């Protein structure tokens, strides 16, 4: 619901380290299908590959595409399902079935032909199809594991990366800078300027905070280290909360546009104890996504366990009416309201 409400059109699964997480994406496809069946909206899906790209692409094709599973969720580009894989590594079957784009990593900040950028320094280069002057794709990232000084690749844990507070060529270390999304905002400016058909945002969440060893460093975290040096948009408890989610919403709306706000209907007096039909003339209707009261119960890191059973009532549609003396509220539920005690 969060992604669809934000205006996200396609969810790109990161399978760049060879693992495809089949159980995970299949479950998401199942849930997306259920959401659509109940009247909701979801993004389309595709995958990005890198390590052993050819084998990864073949596995994805065999498990999902060849049997035709969840066909209505496949993201289409140039008349075929899109897959981000190096054409030089792809099998003939994959080449024939998909529209291919190569993943471009931030080792070189150049515009790229038929290659989509995973991450880049501001002002970001872009990917193009045939005409180098016509952008096809640009990346917008919350933060980058790229050095503040020269844009070269670094680890998020080294202290020199372009974290969430980087902007105007420097790391902003002022109190509360993390709350403002300066880096993310700067990247969005470039996307609005280029206005390509594809803006790829990195990223919704990081699957794991990988700990590595480096020469001279006993501990190194490449992609995710702390609140500043990470690039999750997904909300957190405490800290920056849902700031980056709403910044994503703002960025997408400025890029794609948004519908005009509906006008309110004329004043009307509602007789509380009479038929609900009197609400038919009241506009606008505010709709909530269905199926969002499901209890959450899942293991976290180490011994942590996350549980939330507070969702009770499925509230679907809302209206507000007014006259000279009163304001009236209407709420339609999916099922009978649960008791207050």
Segments and roles (model prediction):
Residues 1-271, 275-276, 283:
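Glycan-processing catalytic domains of CAZymes
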Residues 270-341:
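Surface-exposed, glycine/proline- and aromatic-rich loop segments on solvent-exposed faces
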């Amino acid at each position: 619901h969060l992604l669809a409400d934000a205006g996200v059109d396609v969810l790109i699964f990161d399978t760049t380290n060879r693992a495809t997480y089949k159980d995970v994406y299949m479950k998401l496809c199942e849930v997306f299908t259920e959401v659509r069946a109940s009247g909701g909206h979801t993004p389309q899906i595709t995958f990005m590959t890198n390590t052993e790209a050819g084998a990864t692409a073949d596995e994805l094709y065999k498990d999902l595409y060849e049997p035709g599973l969840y066909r209505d969720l496949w993201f289409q580009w140039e008349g075929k399902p899109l897959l981000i894989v190096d054409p030089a590594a792809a099998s003939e079957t994959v080449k024939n079935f998909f529209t291919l784009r190569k993943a471009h990593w931030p080792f070189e900040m150049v515009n790229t032909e038929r290659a989509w950028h995973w991450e880049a320094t501001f002002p970001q280069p872009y990917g193009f199809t045939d005409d180098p002057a016509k952008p096809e794709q640009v990346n917008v990232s919350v933060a980058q594991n790229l050095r503040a000084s020269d844009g070269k690749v670094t680890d998020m844990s080294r202290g020199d990366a372009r974290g969430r507070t980087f902007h105007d060529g420097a790391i902003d270390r002022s109190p509360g800078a993390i709350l403002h999304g300066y880096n993310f905002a700067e990247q969005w400016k470039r996307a609005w300027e280029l206005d390509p058909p594809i803006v790829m945002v990195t990223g919704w969440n990081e699957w794991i905070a990988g700990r590595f060893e480096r020469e001279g460093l006993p501990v190194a975290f490449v992609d995710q280290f702390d609140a500043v040096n990470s690039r999750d948009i997904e909300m957190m408890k405490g800290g920056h909360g849902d700031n980056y989610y709403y910044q994503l919403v703002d960025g997408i709306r400025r890029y794609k546009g948004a519908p005009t706000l509906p006008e309110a209907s004329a004043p009307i007096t509602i007789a509380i104890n009479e038929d609900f039909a009197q609400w038919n003339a009241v506009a606008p209707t505010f709709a909530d996504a269905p199926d969002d009261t499901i209890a959450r119960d899942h293991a976290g890191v180490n011994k942590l366990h996350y549980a939330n059973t507070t969702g009770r009532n499925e509230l679907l549609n809302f209206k507000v009416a007014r006259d000279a003396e009163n304001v009236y509220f209407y709420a339609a539920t999916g099922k009978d309201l649960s008791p207050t005690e």
